Amino acid sequence: AVKLADASAYYPQAAIIGGWAARNDYYDGNRETLSKLIRGWAEANDYIVANSAEAMESLQKNHYGQTPLSDINEQFKAQKMFTSKDWKRMYSDDTVVNWLQQSTDFFMANANIKDFTPAKTYFDPSLYLKAIV
């Protein structure tokens, strides 16, 4: 494989992020369940950030035995990880909604879709902001 580009060259102005999605009816009726999910994710995420070598070894041993640990470590190092507190700050200061809007704009422009929902409308950080103290 040949590396064509390194996305870190565009950070922090742009980022490729993952996330969670829920239907509106599920979100409205299951806020406590979603808050528990957020708190559980935050605990696991913060553990991985603070103990990455141990966490990668555990992931490889317990879930990805067919994948060499060196490959898992390489994949881990290729991403930028943030603590749950860092995410809270970036949710609060609109960093994340701006990154999401960039992704939305890219996909909509390349799909030639003219009418789409802005990120500030479909992204609701309120549960996360309440769950992470």
Give names to the regions the model predicted.
Residues 100-133:
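Conserved C-terminal helix/tail region of periplasmic/extracytoplasmic solute-binding proteins
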Residues 12-13, 17, 101:
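Bilobed "Venus flytrap"/periplasmic-binding protein-like clamshell domains
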Residues 1-8:
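Ligand-binding "clamshell"
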Residues 15-32:
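A bilobed periplasmic-binding-protein/Venus flytrap-type ligand-binding module shared by bacterial periplasmic
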Residues 6, 23, 83, 122-128:
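Helix N-cap / beta->alpha transition motif
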Residues 12-14, 77-80, 124-127:
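Short secondary-structure boundary/hinge segments and terminal tails
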Residues 28-112:
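Secondary-structure end/capping motifs
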Residues 12, 27-28, 88, 114, ...:
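Generic, ordered loop/turn and secondary-structure boundary motif
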